[in-house]
């Protein structure tokens, strides 16, 4: 119990001193800087419940000699870190005394909790499916892995993808034991025993309730240990041969009613605010009671809430007994020690110790990215000579490449994660015949399913993302495929960046690879807005560039790769050799459509933009032969600039490519502000650049209609170029007016045809590059 109280105290210190570093003294109520206590109370209640379970798992796993992996929500960083920290402190060779160094060590803060606190405790993002999603990814193909998912009841009732267990095979995948902390004043805690069992049986589990609210703590410990042993036995029974397993294998799940010592403090404080009913009965402890108490406290105002916070924290501190954490000699001591076993502490012996301050080091087993045999690119290429004469769907060859890669890869070295947003289009058709992993009877969708399927799909894209993160953190490679208008990269980027920070410098984490179809301007900006994330967004100009890109993505490590293309049929411009050079360079001049001494530069980013820019160049040179135009292609961007993280574009290269004096018109499939920020970072004159941004939303418009409405079509680009060329005196005002009138007439033709036939005009769909032929 003393060990638990030490971790409670450390967690309390971290929570309460979030913005105030410890000054070398034990935590005092006066250190609290928060006016409202409700959020702090809820966090500490969850932290203390987690600390209780960590202690129980530690004792159980020590008895059988196993090395578990414990995954919990990142919001529980204070409890997880406190538990690991206190364990480090009690190790041999770590002499923590009742001094400033000792108290500072016990109250160590983490303002940026990473994903791994040790080789045992792992933190995850609740927005990506939480502990269960990442545990499911880690367990894929890892039969010997045992993972305990500690899930707070507030998270379990809303954000946990419970059906993910139906994707895992008991015979080939690792053991996952979900443990739900049933805290009072949460929705699940209001359910009766029958309702709880019925709920999780319906989810596909075999639940068992562990009641640890008894007065005798030894009985709680014994019940918890027995439940963990039962869960281990039930999992072992599911690993018998398939013909002996039940058709629907229900995995064990524990529902723990946690001790209420801490909750009693809450109830005692709230009892002063709650009134008795008319008949003298006390209002039941429920969600309604918690909401009523919260409303009452807020009505009292900030001053009284602050005062109650101080009084309440005084009770909590007294219960934690911080003054008894040290013995008469000033050393941290416990009457009963239940330490969480992990390899984070690497302390020297007492005779050789050179430091008296405990340090929590995140030491995880060295990861080695699984080698992956990738198919040759050439069989998937489209003939591209002369440029622009052949048309192909930009992502069709990518789908074929990935499907063959998944089929021929070594067992469990590669997985495809297909988002539910990918419902239509050529890319979706490429994966339609790929069997999805499924272990639970009837198929949940029209796509084929199989118990040995290696393609993962789940209705919640966030949970699928979390599963991918767990999978790659085991050193294995993967690709997430979805439609960009429905995906949000921010949570995945933050979680992956945190995972990178947790890895030792000697390890290489496989890249987080994503392919997004149906270009969304918001998602391009979203990916590039993550300034601290190691992100590269690829914009292939055609199908050959697109099929080269996955090969580059899968050969990289420690990077967030995003391939962003339109899933539409576009001309093919580059051979595979030229495509590879373009994608590696990130920014290049296309000589076949350029003049060496240009009067104006037209730049394209992505497949649709490339077609529109080249069509605009043809319009300009046909109407105004005297105009000298340069065509530039932008094939990759990072939050830091043009190019890739491995090969960024320098200021000198940018100036040489787009010139420093000539006007530049850019067609860009993202929000204008993101590209403007990139150009600003290069220190260029913003007046030189005219950005025509666009996005493709599923609004029912044809492609050309959508581009015209956003002033990003070939005709809008040609009009903008004519305006610039006329202003600089390259062409006469009559030539400029003639070109603009021609373009406006073409726009009217396209819009009229789309209104009548609901398709784009043939002069758009059958257009071919003619210059130089």
Indicate where each model-derived feature is located.
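Non-catalytic terminal/interface segments that mediate subunit docking, oligomerization
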Residues: 2-29, 33, 40-45, 49, ...
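Short alpha-helical segments and helix-capping/turn motifs at coil-helix boundaries
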Residues: 51-59, 65-68, 83, 119-120, ...
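Beta-sheet entry/capping signal
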Residues: 66-70, 146-148, 175-177, 206-207, ...
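Thiamine diphosphate
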Residues: 111-116, 130, 142-144, 161-320, ...
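Conserved catalytic alpha/beta cores of large enzymes that bind or transform nucleotide phosphates
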Residues: 510-519, 528-531
């Amino acid at each position: 119990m003393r060990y638990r109280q030490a971790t409670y105290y450390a967690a309390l210190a971290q929570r309460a001193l979030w913005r105030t570093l410890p000054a070398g003294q034990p935590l005092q109520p006066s250190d609290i800087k928060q006016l409202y206590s409700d959020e702090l109370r809820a966090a500490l209640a969850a932290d203390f419940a987690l600390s209780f379970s960590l202690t129980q798992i530690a004792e159980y796993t020590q008895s059988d000699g196993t090395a578990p992996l414990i995954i919990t929500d990142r919001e529980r960083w204070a409890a997880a870190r406190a538990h690991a920290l206190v364990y480090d402190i009690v190790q041999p060779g770590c002499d923590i005394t009742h001094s400033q160094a000792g108290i500072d060590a016990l109250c160590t803060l983490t303002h940026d909790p990473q994903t791994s606190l040790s080789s045992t405790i792992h933190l995850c993002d609740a927005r990506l499916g939480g502990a269960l999603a990442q545990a499911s990814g880690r367990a894929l193909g890892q039969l010997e892995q045992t993972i305990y998912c500690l899930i707070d009841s507030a998270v379990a009732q809303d954000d946990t993808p419970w059906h993910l267990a139906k994707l895992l095979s008991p015979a080939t995948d690792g053991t996952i034991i979900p443990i739900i902390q049933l805290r009072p004043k949460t929705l699940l805690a209001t359910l009766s025993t029958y309702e709880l069992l019925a709920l999780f049986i319906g989810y596909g589990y075999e639940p068992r309730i562990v009641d640890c609210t008894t007065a005798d703590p030894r009985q709680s410990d014994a019940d918890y240990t027995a439940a963990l042993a039962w869960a281990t036995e039930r999992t072992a029974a599911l690993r018998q041969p398939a013909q002996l397993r039940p058709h629907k294998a229900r995995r064990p799940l524990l529902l723990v009613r946690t001790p209420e010592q801490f909750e009693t403090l809450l109830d005692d404080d709230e009892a002063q605010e709650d009134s008795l009913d008319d008949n003298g009965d006390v209002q039941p402890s429920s969600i309604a009671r918690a909401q009523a108490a919260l409303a009452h406290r807020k009505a009292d105002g900030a001053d009284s809430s602050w005062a109650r916070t101080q009084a309440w924290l005084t009770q909590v501190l007294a219960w934690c007994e911080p003054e008894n954490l040290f013995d008469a000699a000033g050393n941290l001591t416990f009457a009963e020690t239940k330490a969480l076993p992990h390899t984070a502490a690497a302390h020297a012996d007492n005779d050789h110790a050179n430091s008296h301050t405990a340090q929590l080091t995140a030491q995880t087993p060295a990861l080695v990215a699984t080698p992956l045999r990738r198919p040759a690119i050439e069989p998937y290429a489209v003939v591209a000579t002369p440029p622009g004469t052949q048309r192909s769907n930009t992502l069709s060859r990518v789908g074929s490449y990935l499907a063959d890669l998944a089929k021929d890869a070594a067992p469990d070295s590669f997985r495809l994660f297909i988002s539910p947003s990918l419902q239509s289009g050529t890319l979706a058709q490429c994966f339609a015949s790929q069997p999805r992993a499924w272990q639970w009877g009837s198929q949940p969708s029209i796509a084929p399913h199989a118990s040995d399927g290696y393609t993962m799909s789940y209705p919640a894209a966030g949970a699928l993302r979390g599963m991918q993160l767990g999978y790659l953190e085991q050193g294995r490679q993967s690709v997430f495929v979805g439609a960009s208008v429905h995906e949000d990269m921010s949570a995945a980027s933050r979680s992956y960046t945190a995972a990178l920070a947790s890895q030792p410098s000697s390890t290489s984490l496989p890249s987080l690879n994503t392919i997004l179809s149906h270009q969304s301007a918001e998602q391009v900006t979203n990916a590039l807005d993550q300034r601290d994330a190691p992100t590269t967004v690829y914009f292939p100009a055609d199908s050959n560039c697109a099929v080269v890109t996955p090969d580059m993505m899968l050969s990289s490590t420690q990077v967030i790769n995003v391939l962003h293309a339109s899933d539409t049929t576009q001309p093919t411009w580059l051979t595979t050799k030229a495509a590879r050079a373009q994608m590696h360079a990130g920014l290049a001049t296309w000589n076949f459509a350029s003049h060496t001494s240009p009067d104006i530069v037209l730049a394209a980013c992505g497949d649709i933009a490339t077609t529109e820019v080249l069509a605009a160049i043809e319009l300009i040179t046909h109407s105004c032969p005297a105009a000298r135009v340069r065509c530039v292609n932008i094939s990759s961007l990072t939050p830091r600039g043009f190019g890739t993280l491995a090969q960024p574009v320098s200021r000198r290269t940018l100036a040489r490519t787009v010139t420093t004096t000539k006007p530049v018109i850019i067609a860009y499939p993202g929000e204008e502000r993101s590209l403007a920020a990139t150009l600003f970072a290069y220190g260029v004159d913003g007046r030189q650049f005219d950005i025509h941004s666009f996005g493709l939303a599923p609004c029912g418009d044809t492609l050309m209609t959508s581009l015209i409405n956003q002033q990003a079509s070939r005709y809008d680009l040609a009009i903008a170029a004519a305006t610039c060329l006329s202003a600089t005196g390259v062409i006469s005002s009559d030539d400029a007016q003639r070109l603009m009138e021609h373009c406006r007439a073409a726009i009217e033709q396209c819009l009229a045809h789309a209104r009548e036939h609901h398709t784009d005009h043939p002069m758009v769909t059958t257009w071919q590059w003619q210059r130089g032929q």
